Amino acid sequence: MVKIRLTRMGRRNRPFYRIVVVDSRKRRDGAYIDSLGFYDPVKDPAVMSVDVEKAVEWILKGAQPTDTARSILSKFGVMKKVHEIKYGKKTEEEGNE
C-alpha cells in the first residue's frame, strides 16, 4: 500500500518534516517515491507548503494519507478537492432538499 506521510529531517531538537509518498513497508525516513511538500513546526506560526495538484493526483491513484498528513492536506483544501472530483460538486439545489 502507498501512503502519504511525514519523514523527519533537521537536526536534534529542530524537527523539520517532508510530506512524501512512500511504500508503507519502508522505514519512516527511508526512500520515498515522491515529495509533496514540507512542514516546519518549530517556526511560529508553523510553516507549511504542499503541491496541491500532486497530492490530489496521488490520492486519486489510491495513496492513503496518515492522520497528520491528512490534517495538513486538509488545510490546503486537498481533501475537499478530491471529494469534489470523486463525487461531484454539490449544487445549491441539492443542498436545499
From Swiss-Prot:
GO terms for molecular function: structural constituent of ribosome. InterPro entries: Ribosomal_bS16 (IPR000307), Ribosomal_bS16_CS (IPR020592), Ribosomal_bS16_dom_sf (IPR023803). One of its GO terms (biological process) is translation. Keywords: Ribonucleoprotein, Ribosomal protein. Belongs to the bacterial ribosomal protein bS16 family. PANTHER family: 30S RIBOSOMAL PROTEIN S16 (PTHR12919), SMALL RIBOSOMAL SUBUNIT PROTEIN BS16M (PTHR12919:SF20). This is Small ribosomal subunit protein bS16. It comes from Kosmotoga olearia (strain ATCC BAA-1733 / DSM 21960 / TBF 19.5.1). The lineage of its organism: Bacteria, Thermotogati, Thermotogota, Thermotogae, Kosmotogales. The gene is rpsP.
